[in-house]
């Protein structure tokens, strides 16, 4: 008789790696895209029960676990993000999703479990040591909670969020901060700056639209929505962003990549970018990794070579 709790390949396995990306839990309320913390907590607790209890388990939250990008402070969305601002944002999310953090604490209590938070474009504030300390304190397991950066590897598996391949959201891994007038600021990529200044003021009225897919069909059926967004970003790029450059705003920059992407998006009226080709080329170029897990796309895909 076969043990119904036996996992395929379990006799050879020494560790189970669970990768989850793009949860995007926010600060609660109608604007939060993830009101399911209790469900997620119950799901995660299963990795402390049979048949997984026989294995060491790594829970890898592969970027955009927290929607810090769309979390406001005092009703505003600052682009000059200090450690204090980042911590205040994270505290709002922790308060709204206690069930998630309680579940992580319970899982780590079992032993032979580790939790990793990879950085994504919605939670770049995770680079702040102060935010990392806050999360470790809330989960109450300092030595089992890790922050590997924008990617991590386990054996011959590479886990990366994927936003580092997106020119809108790429952050220099070795220079995630800016120094300005004695303050340490988060080096926000230009795509994040644009969303904070042009899109987030519309969130209260248009939050529902961000949850509709596929985007192309949504714009075909709701041309007024496309017009509102295009006009908002046109005004931003041709007036507000230029003003910031002239005023030497430290978080604003201009380069050929920015110019090219803005021209493309207005010319095609396509707000999204397909990065499939980039990852296909990486897979074909190197066989260093047997498995590569990528988030960011919000679309289920499977490639093999």
Q: At which residue positions do the language-model features occur?
A:
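Extended recognition/assembly regions associated with phosphoester-bond processing machinery
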Residues: 1-305
């Amino acid at each position: 008789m076969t043990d119904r709790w036996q996992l395929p390949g379990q006799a050879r396995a020494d560790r189970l790696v669970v990768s989850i990306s793009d949860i995007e839990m926010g600060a609660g309320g109608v604007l939060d895209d993830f009101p399911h913390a209790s469900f997620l907590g119950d799901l995660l607790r299963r990795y402390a029960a049979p048949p997984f209890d026989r294995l060491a388990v790594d829970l890898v939250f592969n970027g955009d676990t927290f929607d810090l990008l769309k979390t406001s402070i005092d009703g505003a969305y600052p682009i000059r993000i200090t450690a204090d601002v980042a911590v205040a944002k994270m505290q709002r999310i922790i308060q709204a999703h206690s069930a998630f953090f309680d579940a992580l604490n319970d899982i780590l209590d079992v032993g032979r479990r580790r939790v990793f938070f990879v950085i994504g474009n919605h939670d770049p504030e995770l680079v702040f040591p102060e935010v990392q300390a806050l999360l470790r304190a809330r989960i109450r397991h300092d030595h089992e909670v890790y922050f590997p950066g924008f990617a991590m590897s386990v054996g011959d598996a590479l886990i990366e969020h994927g936003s580092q391949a997106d020119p809108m959201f790429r952050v220099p891994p070795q220079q995630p901060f800016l120094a300005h007038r004695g303050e340490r600021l988060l080096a926000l990529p230009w795509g994040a700056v644009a969303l904070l200044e042009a899109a987030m003021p519309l969130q209260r009225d248009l939050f529902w639209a961000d949850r509709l897919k596929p985007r192309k069909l949504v714009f075909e059926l709701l041309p007024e929505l496309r017009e509102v967004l295009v006009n908002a970003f046109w005004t931003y790029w041709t007036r507000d962003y230029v003003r910031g450059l002239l005023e030497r705003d430290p978080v604003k920059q201009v380069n050929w990549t920015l110019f090219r992407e803005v021209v493309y998006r207005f010319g095609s009226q396509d707000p999204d970018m397909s990065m499939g080709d980039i990852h296909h080329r990486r897979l074909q170029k190197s066989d260093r990794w047997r498995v590569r897990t990528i988030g960011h796309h919000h679309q289920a895909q499977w490639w093999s070579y």
